[in-house]
Amino acid sequence: MNENQRDKTRREMILRLVIHARKDSLISMRAEEMAKYMDVSKVTMYKYFSSKDEILSLVISHFANYMCNKDVLSTYEGESILERYQKTFEQSLMINYYFPESFFNDFKGYNPRLYEEIVDAQQFRFKHLEEMYRLGAEQGVFYPVNTAIFILEDELILRRILDPSFLVQHGLTLEKALFDYYEMQKRKLIRQKYLNIMDDSWIEELIPSFVAKNSRNL
């Protein structure tokens, strides 16, 4: 197996672990459990990773790479600020689904170095979102907003929406709750003139797809 194929396989195994272990503590997870979530044997897992610490380090690298994804956070020629906002909404949804608050708390107590990587990635994303909101306001597309509070709303509200007990308590489906939250946020952020011309077809595909793929893992 060449190095590129090996790296690809390692990334796929880490991704499977993150997807399937979102409810569990990675820090306290045994090697056998990690291998199970990766869908490989323990022996095979250790052919690709030298230790549990290496696996945890790569999980954080995966998180940081997604948080700092320039395809999401940067503006490209021909891309509107509205399209960029929609990409950041998807990113917020995925971050809050795959990386619950307990994930961060685990690493804060277990490994300060890895936790620092988490904080650095969060700060990188914050600065780029702050720039996006500032640019949108300058263009007259967005209302001026407090970036820190807007991001905090995503963390608090999306995590509650992704909690099945909240949905049951309020008689909501996950799909309706996500659509309602998206509508609420964009109406707080985007001026009416641009709401009237905004193309939400991509979000209308994203949310049902997310629900179909992930609702049973909540």
Residues of each region from the PLM?
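Hydrophobic alpha-helical connector segments
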Residues: L58, N69-F99
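Short hydrophobic/aromatic patch on the recognition helix
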Residues: M38-F49
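Conserved hydrophobic residue
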Residues: L26-I27, E138, F142
